[in-house]
Structure formats: C-alpha cells, structure tokens
Amino acid sequence: METVTGQRVRAKRLIRSDKLEKLTDHDIHVLVDEYELRTVIDLRTDKERELSPDPTSRMPEVKFVNLPVFTEGAVGITHEHDIRSLMKEFSQMKEDPYKIVRNIYPMALLGDEAVKAYKQFFDILLEQEEGAILWHCSEGKDRTGLASLLILHALGVPPETIMEDYLATNIFARKKLRRVAHDFEHLHLLKKGDEALLAFLTAEPGYLNAACEAAEEKYGSLDSYLEEGLGITPEKRARLAEKYLF
C-alpha cells in the first residue's frame, strides 16, 4: 500500500480482522510466528466479548487490550447477533437499512467513547517497538474499518486507496453472506430481509464517507480531527511513519 509520498506501508505490521474466536491452530501459528503478532486490540463491548471471547489462553505471547468504541447502551445494530435475532430485526425494519448504518458511522468516529478508544489505539501504535498489531470488532468492517481509516490517513495513504482497502471487506465476507442468506431463504425471509442483510454485512462507500464528512463538519478536515480530537501531532505522525512505512 503506497502513500502520497511514494513510501509503502510495512507488510505484516498492521492487521485488521473480524472476531477471533474461530481461529484455528494454523491461523494462530501464522499470526504469532510468521507475522510476529504482539498486540490484539478488541474494539467491541464487554457483552460482545462475553459472547465471542478472544482466544487469549491459546496466544500467551500476545497482549490483549480492550478498547470499546461504543458503550453497551449505544452499540445498537453493530452488536453481535445470532441469525434469528437478525431476522427478527430485519423483518420489522421500516427505515432504509443503508441509512441506519450510515448514521452509525459518525458516532463510531466522533462519539466520546470512540475518541477515547482511538486515542489509546494510537498510543499503542506509537509505543510498540516491534511485531504486528491486530485490531478487530465483530465483522471487521465498521469500528475496525474506521480505525484502519485513521491510521492509514495518518500515514499518508491516499483516500482512494483507503476506500479500496475498506471495500475489500466484501471479498472476505462473501462466505458468511452466503451462509446467512441461505438461512434467510430457508425460513422464507430472504425477500423481506435481503436489502437489510446486505446493508449490515457489507461495506459501502457511503458509510466511510459519512464518517469523513462528519469529521470535516466538526473539525474542518480529517487531519484536524487527528490532531485536535485525538492529539496526533505532526511529530507523532512522523514517528508513526518511521515505524510503519519504508
């Protein structure tokens, strides 16, 4: 991934992911031994972690840090759901599901809990001397996608490349989307819930743009949000570049 100055993001240092509970032994071997994973940042709420805990006991070499972007009361539709609760919500939904998700993104970037989490996220990025850092939420696209937006922007990656990376979520989500769609179809709910299904399980340009526009409206630019909102000064951005670019 190339920056506007022609530098590149170092491979195997910055990793975004969905929940980790289903990691195989081989997955853990690759992350710990090949990627030299040293820190995992969990952006989910306590309740989400209880439902799908990280495999901490299987990765003793790794430090796990909990940085919830939402409070329990605010997490709403981004909360971990089973298929039946998803179907119930989708069948009762009256508002445009894409609009619902778009409205979540500004809060997930600018909310008090989110700002607190992203400040600590950058502290960890600045403090880690070696090895990889992995951050994740439940699906790996909303909270995790915004964290990726922030670090990549801070490193000077152009917006179109950041968007391309964000939308790559849809490639990796196809298997899950097919499985959930099959459950909908089996229970004769696909026609009623298919749009909502796509809205909540896929990445859309409008989602990330909604967050960026909210930051620009409040701070003037994403750069100003980084500096004024999160305390990422030009000096800190230079340190990040030294660590994660070549």
Annotated model-derived regions:
Residues E139, R143-T144:
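Ser/Thr-glycine-rich phosphate-binding loops at phosphate-binding pockets of nucleotides
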Residues M1-L134, A147-F246:
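Cys-dependent protein tyrosine phosphatase-like superfamily
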